[in-house]
Amino acid sequence: MVILEFRPGRGTLLLSMDPMDNAALLIVGHGSTVNPASSTPTLLHAATIRSRGIFAEVASCFWKEEPSLRDALFFFRDPGIRDVYVVPNFISEGYFTRTVIPRELELTGAETERASGQVWKYCAPVGSHETMTTHLLERAREIAPGVTEKETTLLIVAHGTSLNDNSAVAAKEQVEKIRQLDRYAAVLNVYMEEPPLVSDWVNLTKTPNVVVVPFFISDGLHSYEDIPALLGIPEGRASARPGHALSAEHKLHGRSLFYSTALGTDSRFADVIIEQAMAFAGKQVFQSA
């Protein structure tokens, strides 16, 4: 049985569902050798999912931290676990999801049968989930409550270089979807390292209010230090460490600028991870309203 909580205008929240006693969940994150906060969202989402008792086991692994993707090959030794759902906690399809993760986890396709007979099932990354648009809008509303949307420009920030082109494409796709809703005065995709540049926000926007949401999984150095600096947010206006919200409203250039933490820090991403696994299994448990 699936239990959902309906939230008017905000979709449905997965509360519980029948356990999959013969299945495990592996959440794959990027991680960082210099910023431990990079892995925090993945670990927190794993703990949330584990507490719900849906899967027999829930584990995480990382490209740049321990446990590594190679370490994960030795997880899930319980012979009762017949299926392992692998969900990349990445914002878009790209080099890591198409090349690095399959190579390191020795995946041969959508389904890979191990010598033990255990089947590893490679799911779509969280950023490709249909509810990303809803999550972006919710985050924008949460950091700028009561602000008139028709007097507001919404900026979706991605990295945006040739090395990370798919994240730029994903941001642009989300912007197009939000534009079609005709809620904000303007909706723009901006980037750290290619035009249109987030640092040029004053010239790109004309409204008295500007809301900025980083389209990133975690509050790493980009979303916590680099982007605020590019926006011109004074040092010291941020909280003491990554993973904690910045002071949301900043008065800059005669405007009200609202800056969010990275989208993937939202606790509701745990539901997205579950849904990506369940979608592979053919079970629909999360619907956006």
Question: In which residue ranges do the predicted regions lie?
Answer:
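Active-site-proximal alpha-helix that buttresses catalytic centers in soluble enzyme cores
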Residues: L15-A289
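Short, positively charged and aromatic/hydrophobic N-terminal segments
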Residues: I3, T12-S16
